[in-house]
């Protein structure tokens, strides 16, 4: 049974995995107060997906609630079309309206890509009411290095994904490429996988590889997460 991570829990998981490659190879255990006996098997099972996951979109939190619509193909480098936020963003795009849903591999070892995508759509449809609506809300999918999808839903709706079959983590998403407001993985527009222009794809690969070697600033991230929680 999967458990949706709270903001504070997500930040602690992020602190564990936002480390150098050596730290990923020999990770320290999660704090015991975050893992109950009931949920520890699920969390440790999901942990196996995180190193690959962070190559696309790392587990991050941010303190603002941005509005506006998201279109990775139409968005440019200008952030002025986004409304004012509560505080300066730590991770652009992490607005608690875009969520990364990490899943177990759907359909078994021999599942085809389209079968996996259908499973993602069906999973979200259980929450939003129909597969047609689910296709509109999913903005990216991953069927290779990790399994899951990104969807644009509010925080209350994201909580309803907790415990659905196959769901491991429900995490706030953030941009891999802030210049183009791009969350990474494969773009999913109007129910179909859409390729990026070649130059955008090359840029995405470079950013993805770079992110694997970046050393995060844990203390600033955790301090601002706590600040956000104190404001609630």
From Swiss-Prot:
A Pfam family assignment: MORF_dom
GO cellular component entries: endoplasmic reticulum; mitochondrion
Region listing for Disordered, in residue ranges: 208-232
Keyword annotations: Mitochondrion, mRNA processing, Transit peptide
Protein's cellular compartments: Mitochondrion
Ranges of biased composition (kind: Basic and acidic residues): 212-232
Parts forming coiled coils: none
GO MF, one annotated term: mRNA binding
Primary role: Involved in organellar RNA editing. Required for the processing of few RNA editing sites in mitochondria.
Family designation: Belongs to the MORF family.
Protein name (Swiss-Prot/TrEMBL): Multiple organellar RNA editing factor 6, mitochondrial
Organism: Arabidopsis thaliana
């Amino acid at each position: 049974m999967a458990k949706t991570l709270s903001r504070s829990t997500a930040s602690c998981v992020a602190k564990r995995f936002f480390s150098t490659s050596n730290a990923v190879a020999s990770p320290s255990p999660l704090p015991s107060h975050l893992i109950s006996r009931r949920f520890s098997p699920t969390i440790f099972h999901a942990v196996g997906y995180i190193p690959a996951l962070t190559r696309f979109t790392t587990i991050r939190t941010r303190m603002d609630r941005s509005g506006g619509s998201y279109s990775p193909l139409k968005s440019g480098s200008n952030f002025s079309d986004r409304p004012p936020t509560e505080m300066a963003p730590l991770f652009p795009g992490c607005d608690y309206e875009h969520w990364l849903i990490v899943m177990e591999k759907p359909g078994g070892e021999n599942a085809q890509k389209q079968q996996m995508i259908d499973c993602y759509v069906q999973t979200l449809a259980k929450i939003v009411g129909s597969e047609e609506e689910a296709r509109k809300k999913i903005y990216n999918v991953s069927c290779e290095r990790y399994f899951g999808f990104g969807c644009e839903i509010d925080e209350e709706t994201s909580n309803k994904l907790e415990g659905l079959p196959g769901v491991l983590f429900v995490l706030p998403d953030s941009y891999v490429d802030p210049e183009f407001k791009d969350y990474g993985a494969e773009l999913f527009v109007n129910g179909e996988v859409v390729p990026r222009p070649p130059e955008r794809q090359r840029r995405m690969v470079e950013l993805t590889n770079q992110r694997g070697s970046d050393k995060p600033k844990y203390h600033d991230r955790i301090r601002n997460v706590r600040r956000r929680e104190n404001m609630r």
